[in-house]
Curated annotation (Swiss-Prot):
Lineage: Bacteria, Pseudomonadati, Pseudomonadota, Gammaproteobacteria, Chromatiales
Name of this protein: GTPase Obg
Xref: SUPFAM superfamilies: Obg GTP-binding protein N-terminal domain (SSF82051), P-loop containing nucleoside triphosphate hydrolases (SSF52540)
Region (Disordered): 127-146
Naturally occurring in which organism (per UniProt): Thioalkalivibrio sulfidiphilus (strain HL-EbGR7)
PANTHER family, alphabetized: DEVELOPMENTALLY REGULATED GTP-BINDING PROTEIN-RELATED, MITOCHONDRIAL RIBOSOME-ASSOCIATED GTPASE 2
Superkingdom of the organism of origin: Bacteria
Amino acid sequence: MKFVDEATIKVKAGDGGNGCVSFRREKFVPFGGPDGGDGGDGGSVYLVATHDLNTLADFRFQRHYEAQRGENGSGRNMTGASGADLEVPVPVGTLAYDAETEELIGDLVEHGQRLLVAQGGFHGLGNTRYKTSTNRAPRQSKPGTPGELRVLRLELKLLADVGLLGLPNAGKSTLITQVSGARPKIADYPFTTLYPGLGVVRVGPLQSFVMADIPGLIEGAAEGAGLGIQFLKHLSRTRLLLHLVDVAPADPAEDPVAAVHTIEAELQQFSEDLASRPRWLVLNKIDLIAPDERESFTKELVARLGWEGPVYAISAATGEACESLMQAIMKYLEEAQSHDADTATAG
């Protein structure tokens, strides 16, 4: 079972600056010697691992990265400035392959780790370098070399940040489709996986997270019939659970409160660790409740449940309030990550 996010990007290092052909020209110095300076080195391209990213979603919007070229040399033996290196942030855990040869260039496993993926071009030489005892006025110089051009395939094992709970008719797959398909603010992203209930949600530049449906909780999951060990491992870093409830079931006899209790009991039996994660109540299909009745309906349902955590009312089908829910999730995940970082520093 593979949960893999992939992206293909093109990286181009900066070309080296050219050397200069120049001669010293001053009053009373009729035969000034060569004074052409060297060019500057081209900038290189590095991938830099960061905990601030969870997915490769941003590479859907920018696929080409180019470092600065070196400046040309000039007279008076002035050397051209070197081009600035370009650092491309990627999530920790990213594997970088050469797309043409499939050679593994590197595995970025630590925050702050840098991986050289395209070497900058070397500087050219000015004509000063070619002065000899027999050639006092060389008109020869050397151009800079081109920077390396490479197509990379980036691969990242996806781990779910947010898990979805709920009965089969609660609208989990509809929500994943809605939030990973509403462009441009929350963009769909083609990733390869054998598991369909997984979505990369892009909230904004450098802001994305992975949402996963937790399947089969009702069908004997506590006895191991539903989730396998691999999928449990996949959910190991889930920071937040969204508990989806169908507030307008097709069968009026179905009680949303009973549906919540059913899932809670099964979850507790299935995994105490997962059951202890923070959980938000998401009331789905709110569009089927009359607008003037929604507030009282929500209050009554929350009171019957004795629910004290966050509550959101949405419509996965129409997209109503979905974006604000995704923004709230992103904020929560960023704050949790920041808290973890502070704790690690203090420890």
